[in-house]
Amino acid sequence: MTQIVFVHGMFQNPKSWDNWVRYFSDKGYDCSAPAWPLHDGDPKALRDNPPAGLGELSLDAIYASIKSAVAGLDKPVVIGHSVGGLIAQKLLADGHVSGAVAISSVAPNAMLDFDWGFIKNSAIITNPLKGDEPVYMDAKTFHGSFANTLSEEHAAVEFEKTATHDSRNVLRDCMGSSGKIDLSRPHEPLLLVAGEKDEIIPADLNEKNFKAYENTGSVTDFREFPNRGHYICGEPGWEEVAAYIDGWLQQNRFDVDNRIYAPSAI
């Protein structure tokens, strides 16, 4: 049975994957959704009482935690959203997984885009004047940037269910050495997924990320979904995205006996 590990991104926790875990479990996959450090629990409780040390959380600490969760499994597939998508790409590059899906992924190697939404949101999060003060997510910001394709009322419901506060240092680290990946090396299958109306990670940046992979002998695919925002995994129509990914997994025959190359080749 193929194992799937779902990795959430900033301002979310494993709660955001509940529908996906059910969907892929019903398809016969063995699914898990580990929390980042300081992100386990009910999102509202985490918002009301932010964990001590949240503002100091680093990408390296998150990666180490997720890598540890993956290490106890049998070369799973990893599906990650946003920063979770970058973590998925790093796990793939480091040879820890048999395949990866990066949804609305933060791009490696400090790749940038001149989209105004991307610039604005990145600047707010990484503001150096804020030091280690966490980013406090609120319903208005969640609707304006994260769930911009939803109505204000629907976004408010999703905010209550899934939103958390987060560490500025995570995105800062993504832009530094911790976010670097050697894109010239061979890798096992990778799918990058983008949302047309994403205000946080523009589809153009996801496509740029896709085109930066240089090894023509490795499977690297890209799919953009129309009318989707950064909340692509939770907004109406998420089932279409999940079904496409399921089809891609089947097409690439994901199990540990059908790897493109042995780990020793990495």
Residue ranges and their predicted role:
Residues 186, 192-194, 198:
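Short beta-strand/loop motif that positions the catalytic acidic residue
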Residues 79-84, 88:
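Gly/Ala-rich beta-loop-alpha elbow adjacent to hydrolase catalytic centers
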Residues 60-76:
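Conserved acidic catalytic loop of the alpha/beta-hydrolase fold
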Residues 24-49:
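Conserved alpha/beta-hydrolase
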Residues 202-212:
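Short alpha-helix in the alpha/beta-hydrolase fold that links the catalytic acid
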Residues 9-12, 196:
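Active-site glycine-rich loops that stabilize anionic/oxyanionic intermediates
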Residues 96-130, 169-176:
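Flexible "cap/lid" loop of the alpha/beta hydrolase fold
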Residues 219-266:
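Catalytic active-site module of serine/aspartate enzymes centered on a nucleophile-bearing elbow/loop
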